[in-house]
Amino acid sequence: MFQKNSSDGYSSVLPGIELKTLVYGEKTLMTEFLLEKGRQLPKHSHPHEQTGYLVKGHIRLTIGAEMFDVMPGDSWCIPGDLEHSAEIVEDSVAIEVFSPVRADYLPE
């Protein structure tokens, strides 16, 4: 599968948090998140392993009991079923990959 860059395809996950599925295959799904300064991703978990890379901005990411100040170029891996949350310190862009594929993030 090949996906051309486009400004279309974003959907609101929460106020100030936009998601776009970039590409997906049989085992992984890649997303782009646009994150607005001052917003929170509440503590949650899911069965998917989640790896990410911060393209721009600044977020505070809590994975389990550990908190990380995430800056551009930093990356992370969150095992499936582990609680995590994020505070958006500056307007940010993050790329995240989920495995297995998250059916709720597939384009309609």
Which residues make up each language-model segment?
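A short, N-terminal "cap"/entry segment at the start of jelly-roll beta-barrel domains
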Residues: 1-27, 107
